[in-house]
Each structure stands twice: as structure tokens, then as C-alpha cells.
């Protein structure tokens, strides 16, 4: 009981502060403007100063230095673009590849309208959304793994 600090509601000074709308803080110090205008900027600027100080004192290289005379055989995008890269690489017609990429968000936008009558949050009671998620995850992983392989060994999707 001695660890927790509870305000004495019988204290007339505290009752006067509560009547003025000063909040339930025992000291009567409101959050606005004290915390939001003075303490938060100090914490934010201190965090930024620590990050800048660490970056200046201990800079780390991001990979190895670039050599303009030695380019790789195949330039790969960042990891989150692997499925899109694989679609563009395997589909022979580039317009078809772009249409396939546009169809992914368009298909995801139709899922809420397919299950608008289903109000359950349990994924086992929402078969359409669960199936779309599982199939989309498997296809994205398959395309992502295929993008990391060389062109001659790449997963071609049967096209």
C-alpha cells in the first residue's frame, strides 16, 4: 500500500483543483502545455541527438563500395519487389505483365465485397478471405523465390 500513491480526495486543496478542471494529478500540473510543449520536444530532440551522435562517432558502411568497372550479370531489385520482378521476367508480353500487377490490388479490393455479409472475425468462418490470403501468400513466396534464381533456372509459371 505504501508503494502506490493515491490522492487524498478529502483534501480541500485537491478538491479545489479538481473543481477547476486541473485533472486528477495530485500536484495539479496539467499535461497541456507543460508536458506537450516542454518535455516531449526535449525527449524527441534528445533521441535525435543520440542517433546523430552515434552516426557521426561510429559510421557503418552500407555494403561494399561500388566498382563501376565490374557490373553483376543480373541486377536484382530489393527483396520486396521480387514477386513483381518475377512476373515481369516470366511473362513474355510486357503489357500482360503490367496488367497482372494491376490485377493484384484490384482483386484484393474485391474481397470485402465478396464477404460483406459475413461479420465473423474468426478466419475459419471466413473461407473466401482465408483462401485469398493463403493462395496469395503461396504465390508471392513462389514468385519471390523464383526471382532470386538465375534466368535459365527461374520458375517460369508454365508459360
Swiss-Prot record:
Biological process terms in GO annotation: photosynthetic electron transport chain
Electron transport is among the record's keywords: yes
Membrane-related topology note: Multi-pass membrane protein
Record-linked PROSITE patterns: CYTB_CTER
GO cellular component, one term: chloroplast thylakoid membrane
Transmembrane segments: 36-56, 95-115, 131-151
Compartments, as annotated in UniProt: Plastid, Chloroplast thylakoid membrane
Main location as per UniProt: plastid
InterPro entries named among the record's database cross-references: Cyt_b/b6_C, Cyt_b/b6_C_sf, Cyt_b6/f_cplx_suIV, Cytochrome_b_C_euk/bac
HAMAP family according to UniProt: Cytb6_f_subIV
Protein name according to UniProt: Cytochrome b6-f complex subunit 4
Upper classification of the organism: Eukaryota, Viridiplantae, Streptophyta, Embryophyta, Tracheophyta
Record gene name: petD
Amino acid at each position: 500500500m505504501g508503494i502506490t500513491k493515491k490522492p487524498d480526495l478529502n483534501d480541500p486543496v485537491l478538491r479545489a483543483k479538481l473543481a477547476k478542471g486541473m485533472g486528477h494529478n495530485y500536484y495539479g500540473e496539467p499535461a497541456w502545455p507543460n508536458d506537450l510543449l516542454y518535455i516531449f520536444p526535449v525527449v524527441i530532440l534528445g533521441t535525435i541527438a543520440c542517433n546523430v551522435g552515434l552516426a557521426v562517432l561510429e559510421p557503418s558502411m552500407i555494403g561494399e563500395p561500388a566498382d563501376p568497372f565490374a557490373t553483376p550479370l543480373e541486377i536484382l531489385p530489393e527483396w520486396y519487389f521480387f514477386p513483381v520482378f518475377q512476373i515481369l521476367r516470366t511473362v513474355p508480353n510486357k503489357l500482360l505483365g503490367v496488367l497482372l500487377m494491376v490485377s493484384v490490388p484490384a482483386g484484393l479490393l474485391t474481397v470485402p465485397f465478396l464477404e460483406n455479409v459475413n461479420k465473423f472475425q474468426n478466419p475459419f468462418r471466413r473461407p473466401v478471405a482465408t483462401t485469398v490470403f493463403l493462395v496469395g501468400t503461396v504465390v508471392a513466396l513462389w514468385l519471390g523465390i523464383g526471382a532470386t534464381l538465375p534466368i535459365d533456372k527461374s520458375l517460369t509459371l508454365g508459360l
